[in-house]
Amino acid sequence: MTFPMEVWMNMLMIESCADAADTIAAGAAGSVEQFIIYMNDKAKELGLSETHVDNAIGLDIGNGYNEMYSTAEDIAKLAKEYMRIWVLADIVAKAEYTVPDCDVLAGRKLESTNYYLTKPELYHSDLFEVIGTKSGRTDAAGTCQVITAKDKDGRKLICCYFGGKSKDTIFKEMTGLLEYCYSNIK
């Protein structure tokens, strides 16, 4: 099955498709193993001093990958970096994406796991809008969400939440946190 990189990136960033992560890794670096080496070098280059990669999928110790770890601070730095790349910023702002048909599969619709994009009526705020997001879940980290938001003055904030018990809890607490921040920054 052959897709352009943009399709694989949409599959990875919108719905966290593990097969897309491995395909991107192998395609970009020649093998998943070489990609892991590249990602650890890139993490150092970006100043992500508390991050180590040992798989392309993003699974951690709770899922049997003992050398995969990061911190909220490093993830926020990474989010800031990927929001500078317009193709990635565009992808993480989508509520949905339709994977095109290919020679062996019919196309299918992917839906973002971000309630700010898929259920905006539940988590609307007059103080900010969400312009990018990535969610995930592992046994060790729990339910996680990274949000990039901006207010009417264009001020951007990146908010990371790890260890959530449920998506609803994360979105309620992140909305409160972002509203607090935007109400109090000058």
Give the residues covered by each predicted segment:
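Active-site-proximal loop and beta-strand segments within enzyme catalytic domains
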Residues: 1-11, 15, 21, 25-34, ...
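Short flexible coil/turn linkers enriched for glycine and charged/polar residues
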Residues: 15-16, 153
